[in-house]
Each structure stands twice: as structure tokens, then as C-alpha cells.
């Protein structure tokens, strides 16, 4: 396989949307390096590399900088990175760039499923014009309920464990120009996660507007089946020999979940209706 033909695939989403599943599907393919939030195992390439574990990190620090220090003006620069922003993003992405270079040298496809990588989309399209991007989505009610179980790192109502702070800070907070900014301090946890689901999906959708149709796809995790996987792999330019058991349920959330009472549905709909409708999910 020529260097220019090596597939590069980036899967982005809110988290709890199926990135773990897509990582496992890609990992089951021959001649492919698949990572989930920076972690993976080398299954192809020189014998000396086989079995090597990668731990590149999920890059939460860049999101934490944008949302909790830099401000909206700097955040907007990531949509069309200038030279200074590109230099910063190059440094943040350096370890992955090295892995991609290794894959290209060895003729191996590179697949990156990362729920923290959405702010790199436009940078990556400029850096790798042939790369394919998948916006992986999940029904908002199911996704928010799943996130509600992750109370240590997702807008917790109590003090987090030290290990969860970087994950917590990677979650966005409203910029002053946003309508909900003045209400944020009074939002309960359900409202914050609902806003998060809508905001991250809207962010990705706006970034996708700047990417050619041939390089992008919006994919509902509910529609990822043995029957649809071949078409997904064809879009990505990847081998078709996936293992069906890679679709088995995995990485479930644990802990108590919110209940969809009429009041909670009202709160969710007030914040997340725009993206529910845009993505083709029915409101309750």
C-alpha cells in the first residue's frame, strides 16, 4: 500500500455514543492501528512492534484550556487555525502525528476514536486532507442517561476524585455570549449534561460544515450493525474483514442514572431539541 493510500479515520462524538464500539470494530481489521482515546495495541507492522501498547492520552488538556481559560475568541480560532494556533495544536497532537507517520511508513491504516478530539477536526482536515471523519451520535435521552451514571467526571454535584479532575475540566462550560451563561450556576446536573450533549454535537456539526462531503459522515450508533458495517468501512477505505463479535455490548456505565420523568424530559427538550431534530431523533 502506497503512503498516500493509507487510510486515516477520525471518529468524534460526545462520549457514551459508541466510540468504544467503533474502536473495537476497527481493531478487528487486518493491517490497521486502532486507538480509543489514545490507547491501543499494535496488531500489524514489523514483528518487533507487535503487541506494543500505545498510551497517547485523550488530550483533555486542550479542551480544558479552551473552555476554562482561553475564552471564546481563542476557541473560534480552532475552526480556521492561524499559524500560532496551528503551532499549539501541532504540539498537542505531536505523539499522534508520530504514530500516523509510523503507520504511513509501514502501510498501516490509522483509526482514532476519541470523544475529546472534536476541537481538532478542522486542524486535522488541513493537516491530512484525505482523512475521513465520522460524527458518531446517539439518541440524546440514552446518551444523557448514560453520562449521568458517570457522576465523578461529568458535572458532578460533589467534589471529584483527584483522578477525575482532568476529565471534568475537559467538559465545556458556556461562554459569556451564550444564552445559558447567566443560568448555568442554577442548572441542575441533568440540565448541564443535556446542554453538553447539544453543544458538543452542534460544535462538531459546525466544524463538519467546513469539510467536503466526500470526507465526512454522520453516523447513528443505533444503525451500526453487521449489515451496515461494510458500507461504513467502504467509506473509510478500510478492509472489510471485521469480526462480528466486535459489536458486542462493551464498556457500560455504572452507578445510578437519572429517570426520564415528564419534568426531566421538559428540561432536556428545552436545551437539546435543536440537535435532536437536526440529527433525526424524535423528541418525547
Predicted regions and their residues:
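Acidic-histidine catalytic/liganding microenvironments
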Residues: 29, 128, 211
Amino acid at each position: 500500500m502506497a503512503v498516500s493510500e493509507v487510510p486515516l479515520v477520525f471518529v468524534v462524538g460526545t462520549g457514551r455514543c459508541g466510540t468504544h464500539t467503533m474502536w473495537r470494530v476497527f481493531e478487528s481489521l487486518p493491517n490497521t492501528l486502532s486507538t480509543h482515546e489514545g490507547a491501543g495495541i499494535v496488531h500489524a507492522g514489523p514483528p518487533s512492534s507487535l503487541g506494543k501498547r500505545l498510551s497517547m492520552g485523550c488530550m483533555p488538556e486542550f479542551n480544558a484550556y479552551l473552555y476554562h481559560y482561553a475564552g471564546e475568541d481563542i476557541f473560534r480560532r480552532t475552526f480556521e487555525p492561524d499559524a500560532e494556533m496551528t503551532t499549539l495544536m501541532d504540539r498537542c497532537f505531536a505523539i499522534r502525528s508520530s504514530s500516523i507517520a509510523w503507520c504511513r511508513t509501514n502501510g498501516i491504516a490509522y483509526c482514532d476514536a476519541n470523544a475529546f478530539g472534536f476541537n481538532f477536526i478542522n486542524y486535522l482536515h488541513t493537516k491530512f486532507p484525505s482523512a475521513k471523519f465520522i460524527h458518531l451520535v446517539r439518541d440524546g435521552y440514552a446518551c444523557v442517561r448514560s453520562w449521568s451514571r458517570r457522576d465523578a467526571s461529568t458535572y458532578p454535584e460533589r467534589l471529584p476524585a483527584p483522578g477525575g479532575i482532568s476529565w471534568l475540566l475537559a467538559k465545556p462550560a458556556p461562554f459569556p455570549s451564550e444564552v445559558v451563561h447567566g443560568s448555568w450556576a442554577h442548572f441542575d446536573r441533568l440540565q448541564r449534561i443535556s446542554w453538553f450533549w447539544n453543544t458538543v454535537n452542534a460544535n462538531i456539526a459546525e466544524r463538519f460544515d467546513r469539510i467536503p462531503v466526500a470526507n465526512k459522515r454522520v453516523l447513528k450508533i443505533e444503525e451500526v450493525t453487521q449489515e451496515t458495517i461494510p458500507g461504513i468501512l467502504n467509506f473509510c477505505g478500510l478492509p472489510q474483514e471485521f469480526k462480528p463479535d466486535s459489536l458486542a455490548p462493551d464498556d457500560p456505565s455504572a452507578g445510578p442514572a437519572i429517570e426520564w420523568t415528564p419534568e426531566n424530559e421538559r428540561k432536556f427538550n428545552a436545551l437539546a431539541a435543536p440537535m435532536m431534530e437536526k440529527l433525526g431523533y424524535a423528541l418525547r
